[in-house]
Amino acid sequence: MQMTHVIINFRRHLKRRNYSKHTVKYYLNIIKQYVIWLDVPLEMVSPEKMDMYIDHLLRKRMHPTSINLYLAIIHVFYDYLRYEEKVDLINPVNRSRRLRVPRPLPRSLRDQEVEKLFDVIKNERDTAMFKLMLRCGLRVEEVANLTL
């Protein structure tokens, strides 16, 4: 399999699927980096080799979100090879390879924001419900299920 022809055909495939020129350029850049990094043919890449690639990206201090994007693009490329180029291979990138992305904690309301909120609330029932949520950390569903 001639890699230059495969990448050119992959580019055509992306354009036919109406990807923007920036997306096509980005995909091809990532695929080229990946192919250069590989020391084995694409057909020989194992899940362990993908783990090594993830470690390589982590050593470059890439964020897990970016690494997951790289993996998704490589997954698309392997699917292209398998279904369009009819290359007999197993896609080494699966969902279990994706990195866990830490979610930021929600920020708390400032005192002024809380005051504005309570200025808008007119009845005692709603005030009590919002105070429970704000001061006790209850969720909307938990407050809705409360009985007296």
Predicted regions and their residues:
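Conserved catalytic core of the tyrosine transesterase superfamily
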Residues: 1-148
